[in-house]
């Protein structure tokens, strides 16, 4: 590779190589290799998806109405989002419009996933990159209680005795030597910056979130029959409004008792995000900011995009409550419109991916996409195909294709909607709750700069939003803010559906085009959703009533992209650049930033290779 510059980053692979394989606490299988300079600063990063995508091949010649049930199995963590993208793609192709109740039910299910996924991601997948669990044993429960009441006075579980009980439980757990989910942590690493009391508070909330998350997904069970993998339907939703005046007789698919249960779970989630999740992220972010840890921005200040979602009025994108658009080349003053139908915008490339195109210098729009595997190691790779010691990033090195927007490597995810110019688009009068995004960001910046530092005796700062957001901390904060926003929107959806039902509209599906005989001979469509990890799109071509071609371009396809033919690096790789490491043999910093994207390799590449390793190997070369 030698040394070269791209997207404002200077890459140099001459330093020693650190290999993390697999990256754990994600969905799927991922490998990461970085090169360090003499000061242990990352100067080159190589992100690899080590699973192969095969679902598009499986779907060929299948019934389009069944596609959602196949693609939903891509991942059980971001469950439902692929099904929703799929039914939207088919409906778009066939010209099907869904009823209002179906739209509102889909909205509530999608937002339930956002809240649930962000909470589970932070506490159970990502928090351990910020929180030293063993350090919590040294905490003073009284001081922990005081900290809790400072950062979140409204949370009722905050007494010294409560934290002491959790600490005793944790102590027994640690002393048993069977740490379970806390096994193999790099406890004591100097990259951890929280005081013991903050660690105890976070571990306590880890346990609280574990209890609550299983209740929230019952919303999916009520509307979709089960979780994971709730049921969807081309043309609407399979649930039926009946017995709405009853108390919930056995066998009633949807009734007032169950609808009131949904409202209770929504309100419960709103309170937890407001009083626990968001305060924890703000407190942790403030302490790490105080330690100078504002790394991990990568492409987030340069190139970001989203399609836009959550329309207040279905089929009217001007009412999107999370607006779409793109920022390119770091120009925060201009929004580039994103059109998933434009063959010159969304394209996939395979120059450095283990796939084959007729002309690998060119990208393909998903409607014309090809998924043909071509697993070959580059000439500078070390090892064998079943025991790779080191990859050759000058050649093919990932099962993830390169997703690009108008030729640009992009970052997607919750951070996108918080960029000032994109956020400003939500302030259109048609976009309900639009002002809320601006208030969220401004209040969070004040809390991190002055509010929490003043309460904790830390140095106050005056970082701008443009300095705080494009960081690992900012990316983590964005998930919490999106969870808060989605919870509030979900309650609006519930009230709107109840009003619609009371007005006499009980329709949940449009089956006018259920029979293939009502379809055109050929059709194509696209469906997109805001998955917890960002922009998720499904493209379909239908011919003679069967799927002719199907392509998914999912969030981790964007963020996990390898290099393209021009040498541009993807969002994962860019985010690791210039990050200092305290102890390279314990890569906390790599995990912290990669986890901030909530990678889902199961989504971006769909079939695990049979020789996939099962234990974490960290190699320093």
Swiss-Prot record:
Q: What is this protein called?
A: Uptake hydrogenase large subunit
One term under GO cellular component:
plasma membrane
Q: Return the InterPro entries for the record.
A: Ni-dep_hyd_lsu (IPR001501), Ni-dep_hyd_lsu_Ni_BS (IPR018194), NiFe-Hase_large (IPR029014), NiFe/NiFeSe_hydrgnase_LSU (IPR050867)
Which organism does this sequence originate in?
Alcaligenes hydrogenophilus
| Gene3D superfamilies for the chain | Cytochrome-c3 Hydrogenase, chain B
Reported function: This enzyme recycles the H(2) produced by nitrogenase to increase the production of ATP and to protect nitrogenase against inhibition or damage by O(2) under carbon- or phosphate-limited conditions.
Catalytic activity, reaction form: H2 + A = AH2
**Which membrane topology term applies here?**
Peripheral membrane protein
């Amino acid at each position: 590779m030698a040394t070269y510059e791209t997207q404002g980053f200077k890459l140099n692979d001459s330093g020693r190589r650190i290999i993390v394989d697999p990256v754990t606490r994600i969905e799927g299988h991922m490998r990461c290799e970085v090169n360090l300079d003499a000061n242990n600063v990352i100067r080159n990063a190589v992100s690899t998806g080590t699973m192969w995508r095969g679902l598009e091949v499986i779907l060929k010649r299948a019934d389009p109405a069944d596609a959602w049930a196949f693609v939903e199995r891509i991942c059980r963590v971001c469950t439902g989002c692929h099904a929703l993208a799929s039914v939207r793609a088919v409906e778009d192709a066939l010209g099907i419009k869904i009823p209002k109740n179906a739209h509102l039910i889909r909205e509530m299910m999608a937002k339930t996933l956002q809240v649930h996924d962000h909470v589970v991601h932070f506490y159970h997948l990502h928090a351990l990159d910020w929180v030293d669990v063993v350090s919590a044993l040294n905490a003073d429960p009284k001081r922990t209680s005081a900290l809790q009441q400072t950062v979140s006075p409204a949370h009722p579980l905050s007494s010294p005795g409560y934290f002491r009980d959790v600490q005793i439980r944790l102590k027994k757990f640690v002393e048993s030597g069977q740490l379970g989910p806390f096994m193999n942590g790099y406890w004591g690493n100097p990259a951890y910056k929280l005081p013991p009391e903050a660690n105890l508070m976070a571990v306590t909330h880890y346990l609280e979130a574990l209890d609550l998350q299983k209740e929230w997904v019952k919303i999916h069970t009520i509307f979709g029959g089960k979780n994971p993998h709730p049921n969807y339907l081309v043309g609407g939703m399979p649930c039926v409004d009946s017995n709405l005046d009853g108390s919930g007789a056995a066998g009633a698919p949807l009734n007032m008792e169950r609808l009131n249960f949904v409202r209770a779970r929504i309100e419960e989630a709103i309170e937890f995000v407001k009083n626990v999740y968001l305060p924890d992220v703000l407190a942790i972010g403030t302490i790490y900011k105080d330690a100078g840890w504002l790394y991990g921005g990568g492409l987030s200040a340069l190139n970001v995009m989203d399609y836009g979602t959550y329309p207040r009025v279905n089929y009217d994108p001007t009412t999107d409550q999370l607006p779409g658009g793109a920022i390119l080349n770091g120009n925060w003053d201009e929004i580039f419109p994103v059109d998933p139908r434009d063959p010159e915008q969304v394209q996939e490339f395979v120059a450095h991916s283990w796939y084959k195109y007729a002309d690998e210098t060119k990208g393909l729009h998903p409607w014309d996409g090809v998924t043909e595997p071509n697993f070959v190691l580059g000439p500078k790779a070390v090892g064998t195909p079943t025991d790779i010691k080191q990859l050759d990033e000058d050649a093919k090195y990932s099962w993830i294709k390169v997703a690009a927007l108008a030729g640009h490597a992009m970052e997607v995810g919750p951070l996108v909607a918080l960029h000032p110019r994109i956020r400003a688009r939500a302030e259109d009068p048609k976009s309900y709750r639009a002002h809320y995004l601006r208030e969220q960001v401004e209040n969070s910046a004040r809390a991190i700069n002055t509010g929490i530092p003043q309460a904790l005796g830390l140095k106050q700062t005056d970082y701008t939003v443009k300095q705080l957001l494009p960081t690992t901390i900012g990316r983590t904060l964005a998930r919490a803010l999106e969870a808060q926003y989605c919870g509030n929107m979900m309650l609006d959806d519930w009230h709107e559906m109840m009003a619609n039902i009371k007005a006499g509209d009980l329709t949940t599906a449009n089956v006018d085009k259920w029979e293939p005989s009502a379809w055109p001979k050929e059709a194509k469509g696209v469906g997109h959703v805001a998955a917890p990890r960002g922009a998720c799109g499904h493209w379909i071509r239908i011919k003679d009533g069967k799927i002719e071609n199907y392509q998914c371009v999912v969030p981790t396809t964007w963020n996990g992209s390898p290099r393209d033919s021009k040498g541009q690096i993807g969002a994962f790789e860019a985010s690791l650049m210039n990050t200092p490491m305290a102890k390279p043999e314990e890569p906390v910093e790599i995990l912290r930033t990669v986890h901030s994207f909530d990678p889902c390799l199961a989504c971006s590449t769909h079939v695990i290779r049979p020789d996939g390793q099962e234990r974490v190997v960290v190699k320093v070369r």
